[in-house]
């Protein structure tokens, strides 16, 4: 074998506690570990994402792998060498790398139960710095557009469908596709904003715990995606979400959450929680597809891994679902308490009609005296103006990936119909809560209020209770009991809305 194409001046640590010669295999490559070096050769295979049938194609792929990985791990990638053929055939290219001990591998450390929070902090720092200097341009930005994001999902799901009801469930694939389409269809504002903020980068795109090593306290991030440039052009939170997903797959969702939170702090990324979940799910689907390929290559154990990855994808898409909740009821029924309690659990944005009314009055959009039903501040025209403004604000938040809880009486069926149209327009799941309490309880709560923006009186509450219209689509929440009970009931209903 000839020498690497660079000078190879980086000395490797001796590997004395593992076999001198070992072999590892992926679905597209074979890695021979020999002494203090690792030699990676491409398999002569064709998949939906690569074509390595000829030596020339494999040569180009090896060179590209070396160049791209030198961005993040220059001390680990030593160059390109060639295996010569004694019969005179074409020399086989191999990527020459520094060999690391298995105990230095992040995946090994995690599965051994070792403390890795410090390592994850270092990885988050390295990745954030890498993304800060990563290439950005108009061509890269196009891969963050709604159409490109949807296309990637559908291409992966189409590949998974080849294995439906053989390796993975066809029903699960269809459910995933539905949730993906709903998220993407209503989030044009979110994806456009990510492009405008410079979040689309030429990244790593294959950040797995198995390919990260801790060397002298510093992380080496190996094996980025090299076979198709466009797939490496991605949202930076998507790049980080890959490792978060993989840590969850290793049984440590807590570490995945820890890493992603640390990355967000170090990079200054402001992606909503829904987008983080969306991309964790995407990476789980990508890995499920890879496991299906491995299964088709004679690795029966890969089937269980594919199923587990789709479970992760489904769970995160459920969390990513953008929801619009109406929390209604008469004054004093505890609807604001319920709205705040649910929002604390799910991270939703609360819009209170009381707050909107106060702001509109302060800026002169609506006028009138408070305290009288159907007139003054509570005239029909003013009530409609308040609810329309609340819905306008909700539309902006929903389109940006934020779930919204609208806190108001919601006694008017026409206003509830407007809210349902908004949910349909933004492809958001809608859930409606109707808070209830006795007239005496409502009156006591109104009297006991300290400050706030509500102008409702006990008399208004009693009058509204007397004219309460049917609300068949509202889940009745009895708020007379402990707060924890009513909030817990609403939380479970919220989660079931897809």
UniProtKB/Swiss-Prot annotation:
Protein name: Uncharacterized protein Rv2004c
Family matches, as InterPro entries: Cell-binding_unc_protein (IPR052732), Kinase-like_dom_sf (IPR011009), P-loop_NTPase (IPR027417)
Residues where ATP binds: 329-336
Pfam families per record: AAA_33
The protein's role, per its UniProt record: Some isolated peptides of this protein are able to bind to human U937 monocytoblastic and A549 epithelial cell lines.
Transmembrane portions of the chain: none
MF (Gene Ontology): ATP binding; host cell surface binding
Domain of life: Bacteria
SUPFAM superfamilies with a match to the protein in the record: P-loop containing nucleoside triphosphate hydrolases, Protein kinase-like (PK-like)
Entries under PANTHER family matching the protein: GLUCONOKINASE, SLR0207 PROTEIN
Compartments where located: Secreted, Cell wall
The organism's taxonomic lineage, starting at the top: Bacteria, Bacillati, Actinomycetota, Actinomycetes, Mycobacteriales
Main location: secreted
Induction of its expression: Expressed in growing cells (at protein level). A member of the dormancy regulon. Induced in response to reduced oxygen tension (hypoxia), low levels of nitric oxide (NO) and carbon monoxide (CO). It is hoped that this regulon will give insight into the latent, or dormant phase of infection.
Note: Has been detected by antibody binding and Western blot in the cell wall fraction but no signal sequence is predicted by bioinformatic programs.
Keywords, ordered alphabetically: ATP-binding, Cell wall, Nucleotide-binding, Secreted
Record's GO cellular component terms: extracellular region; peptidoglycan-based cell wall
């Amino acid at each position: 074998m000839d020498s690497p194409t660079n000078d190879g001046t980086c000395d490797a640590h001796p590997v004395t506690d593992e076999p001198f010669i070992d072999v590892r295999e992926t679905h597209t490559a074979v890695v021979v570990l020999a002494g203090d070096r690792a030699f990676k050769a491409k398999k002569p295979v064709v998949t939906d994402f690569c074509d390595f049938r000829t030596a020339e194609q494999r040569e180009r792929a090896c060179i590209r792998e070396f160049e791209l990985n030198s961005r993040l791990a220059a001390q680990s990638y030593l160059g390109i060498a060639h295996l010569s053929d004694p019969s005179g055939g074409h020399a086989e290219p191999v990527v020459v790398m520094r060999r690391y001990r298995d105990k230095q591998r992040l995946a090994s450390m995690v599965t051994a139960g070792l403390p890795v929070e410090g390592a994850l902090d270092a990885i988050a720092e390295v990745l954030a710095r890498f993304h800060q200097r990563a290439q950005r341009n108009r061509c890269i930005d196009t891969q963050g557009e709604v159409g490109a994001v949807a296309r990637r999902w559908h291409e992966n799901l189409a590949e998974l469908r080849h294995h439906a009801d053989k390796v993975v469930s066809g029903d699960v694939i269809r459910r995933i596709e539905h949730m993906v389409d709903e998220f993407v269809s209503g989030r044009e504002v979110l994806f456009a904003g990510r492009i405008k903020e410079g979040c689309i980068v030429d990244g790593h795109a294959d950040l797995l715990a198995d390919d990260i090593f801790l060397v002298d306290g510093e992380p080496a991030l190996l094996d980025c995606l090299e076979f198709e440039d466009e797939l490496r052009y991605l949202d930076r939170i998507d790049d980080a979400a890959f490792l978060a997903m993989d840590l969850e797959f290793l049984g440590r969702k807590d570490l995945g959450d820890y890493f992603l939170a640390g990355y967000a702090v170090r990079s200054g990324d402001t992606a909503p929680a829904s987008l983080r979940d969306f991309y964790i799910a995407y990476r789980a689907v990508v890995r499920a597809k890879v496991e299906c390929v491995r299964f088709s290559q004679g690795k029966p154990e890969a089937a269980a891994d594919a199923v587990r990855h789709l479970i992760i994808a489904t769970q995160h898409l459920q969390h990513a679902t953008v929801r619009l909740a109406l929390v209604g009821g008469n004054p004093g029924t505890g609807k604001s308490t319920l709205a705040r309690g649910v929002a604390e659990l799910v991270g939703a944005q609360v819009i209170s009609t009381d707050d909107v009314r106060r702001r509109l009055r302060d800026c002169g959009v609506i006028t009138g005296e408070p305290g009288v039903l159907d007139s003054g501040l509570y005239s029909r025209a003013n009530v409609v103006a308040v609810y329309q403004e609340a819905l306008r604000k909700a539309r902006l938040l929903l389109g940006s990936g934020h779930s919204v809880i609208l806190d108001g009486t919601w006694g008017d069926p026409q206003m509830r119909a407007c809210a349902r149209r908004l949910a349909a327009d933004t492809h958001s799941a809608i859930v409606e809560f109707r808070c209830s309490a006795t007239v005496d309880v409502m009156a006591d709560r109104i009297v006991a209020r300290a400050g706030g923006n509500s102008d409702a009186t006990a008399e208004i509450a009693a009058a509204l209770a007397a004219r309460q219209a049917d609300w068949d689509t509202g889940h009745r929440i009895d708020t007379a009991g402990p707060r924890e009970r009513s909030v817990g009931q609403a939380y479970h209903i919220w989660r079931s809305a897809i």
